[in-house]
Amino acid sequence: MNIYLVGGAVRDSLLNLPVTEQDWVVVGATPEQLLKLGYQQVGKDFPVFLHPVSHEEYALARTERKSGQGYTGFTCYAAPDVTLEDDLLRRDLTVNAIARSADGEFIDPYHGKQDLENRVLRHVSDAFGEDPLRVLRVARFAARFAYLGFTIAPETMSLMSNMAQSGELSALTPERVWKETEKALKTQSPHVYFQVLRDCGALAVLFPEIERLFGVPAPEKWHPEIDTGIHTLMTLAIAAQLSPEVDIRFAALCHDLGKGLTPKEHWPHHHGHGPAGVKLVEQLCQRLRIPNPVRDLAKLVAEYHDLIHTVNKLRPETLLKLFNAIDVWRKPERLEQMIMTSEADARGRTGFENNPYPQGDYLRAAFQIANGVSIQEVVASGLQGLAIRDELQRRRQQALAEWKQTQETPLI
């Protein structure tokens, strides 16, 4: 029996990146042998065991054969005669198919170390094409390692394109699509994930609402990049610089979905695209079963981001309506979320990437004024029921009106 460290831990250590979890493969052993040693079996479809002390995963070396559609349609064979090379052959990318023995020797039959040095993501074998989930995984790895200069091998991209055209992606469950997408949104360059999906044809299959934005023009005065799809990915890239939050990044991705509904005869203008996009956000989130908090912020950003761009010109009552709509009184974190996504939108344009966003400070100051109105004083005045709400609203509006008179109108 021989045990090897495999997969991401080997890859990340070779890249001098922190290793967060370790996976092991066991060659030349049976389930009975591992159970006798105190390992606990957890895998139902294939033999995976937890180490009795470290609780890390140890899997028996196995091969997989395609037996049905989708990413679950595989027959697994695990036995003592399966070699390490056999096990590594079934893995997705060469950089993930490197093993390290107990004495520190690397076993690298598919030249993963060379691809790591050359910063290339390349599939191990044509069996890659049997698992549609791998299209998303490669796009996610491209996003994760983009800052290190990694690119996808042309032959791998070609295979991914064939997979997107084959219809196999429809076998992916909504949960798996969102799980990979959520991981991609957490990377340093989440826009790369969606660009890769577009380049191989998968975006049109999985995210048609986003695909539809490419080729839709916006006025060159405000959008020198012109193309709304390009602007969307630029906005996502800026959002990733501003915040690690998935909610903010996803909202940035979806902020202009409504522009995909504008009739061509109205191009390049998109009046009412914000509210129009709310239904598309709902549709996308329902289809992929995206968590409600992520959905709710994306809907608010789609509807109100343009309003925030002109916040200094808003009347006190409109400012209050905005605060009420985003429920900032009960969810004060929403204020920063809305500001950051709106800033990402403003800066996600060619030539505007490093511009300040004074609207953010203006909105923060306005909220401080409105939030400074004492609820206790209103209650103590003897009012009851809805009259309390109406009086609080009146006082907040008055406070904002007085504050606005002291403000110079900045050029926004």
From Swiss-Prot:
Q: Which residues bind CTP?
A: G8, R11, R91, R137, R140
CDD domains tied to this protein: HDc (cd00077), NT_ClassII-CCAase (cd05398)
Q: What's one GO MF term for it?
A: magnesium ion binding
Pfam families linked: HD, PolyA_pol, PolyA_pol_RNAbd
Cofactor(s) this protein cannot do without: Mg(2+); Ni(2+)
Q: Which residues form the HD domain?
A: 228-329
**SUPFAM superfamilies per record:** Nucleotidyltransferase, Poly A polymerase C-terminal region-like
Q: Which UniProt keywords apply?
A: ATP-binding, Hydrolase, Magnesium, Metal-binding, Multifunctional enzyme, Nickel, Nucleotide-binding, Nucleotidyltransferase, RNA repair, RNA-binding, Transferase, tRNA processing
How, per the record, is the cofactor bound? Magnesium is required for nucleotidyltransferase activity. Nickel for phosphatase activity.
Does the keyword section mention RNA-binding? Answer: yes
**Catalysed reaction, written as an equation:** a tRNA precursor + 2 CTP + ATP = a tRNA with a 3' CCA end + 3 diphosphate; a tRNA with a 3' CCA end + 2 CTP + ATP = a tRNA with a 3' CCACCA end + 3 diphosphate
Ligand binding (ATP): G8, R11, R91, R137, R140
* Residues holding Mg(2+): E21, D23
Q: What is its EC number?
A: 2.7.7.72, 3.1.3.-, 3.1.4.-
Member of which family? Belongs to the tRNA nucleotidyltransferase/poly(A) polymerase family. Bacterial CCA-adding enzyme type 1 subfamily.
Biological role: Catalyzes the addition and repair of the essential 3'-terminal CCA sequence in tRNAs without using a nucleic acid template. Adds these three nucleotides in the order of C, C, and A to the tRNA nucleotide-73, using CTP and ATP as substrates and producing inorganic pyrophosphate. tRNA 3'-terminal CCA addition is required both for tRNA processing and repair. Also involved in tRNA surveillance by mediating tandem CCA addition to generate a CCACCA at the 3' terminus of unstable tRNAs. While stable tRNAs receive only 3'-terminal CCA, unstable tRNAs are marked with CCACCA and rapidly degraded.
The UniProt comment on domains reads: Comprises two domains: an N-terminal domain containing the nucleotidyltransferase activity and a C-terminal HD domain associated with both phosphodiesterase and phosphatase activities.
Q: What PANTHER family has UniProt attached to this entry?
A: MULTIFUNCTIONAL CCA PROTEIN
Q: What else is known?
A: A single active site specifically recognizes both ATP and CTP and is responsible for their addition.
Protein known as: Multifunctional CCA protein
Species annotation: Yersinia pseudotuberculosis serotype O:1b (strain IP 31758)
Task: Please spell out the taxonomic lineage of the organism that makes this protein.
Answer: Bacteria, Pseudomonadati, Pseudomonadota, Gammaproteobacteria, Enterobacterales
